[in-house]
């Protein structure tokens, strides 16, 4: 199957849509081993190793490294503050193999923040990164928590650099959205003050916000689809059993995905389950749990964006000026995930 040719070596860099180039300080930090590891950690939480058509048809894999560079570029473009841009660059530095699958493993399905605790220690344990921070006049405390900087990150459904980047990254690499459309979205954004008088990325024109929110909602639905939730729970249980049997350690999860996969393949029973995972082409669901099939009933964090848009009456949330989007977003948020989901294999 085409999905088996998955490789991060083909990762497409499209981040010049945000900025033609990054400051040298950021580029040097991106070259450190702790950041280079993220080239081998995917954005799709292990789902890209399945045979789902959406990944088979993707333009290229999408790594945490590409996402991190893009986030840093967006923050720098709107703030020209190195401290904030570095925090954006490093925000995923502690992402484990299969990313939010480890949150499922930790029982953190709904918040998906359990893996962020290592960010401080991952930066501190990198002599190369610490030296570059010192050379730039930055401290560890300046850059170890991008939540401090609202352009870099804020609470959903607000728009931040992080949410903007993965929305446009997926739009380009997975949904095949033309680069010109992405540039139009980026070019329409400006920094305004939200309801709490805090800086937030805003759209100047409702028609551009409409284009963006269509992409955003499509992504939101995909992130909590039956396929996605099933795959993440399947992998979480596989990792749990690998950890319980000593095939993996928690520290192994903070190497890269190929290392973790090699460990799984070293144990015959786990290897068979991994190979079954690679053959999943989709899912089915129902109220009743099927007899004789592995099935899950699991909820997940609903990510959504309701951006601010400039109107003649000031800045307003897009749901306040577009009833169609408001209805679709409400329907998305209403899903209670109260159904059993099981796999379809190739």
Segments predicted by a language model, with ranges:
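Acidic, Ala/Val/Gly-enriched low-complexity intrinsically disordered segments
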Residues: 1-3
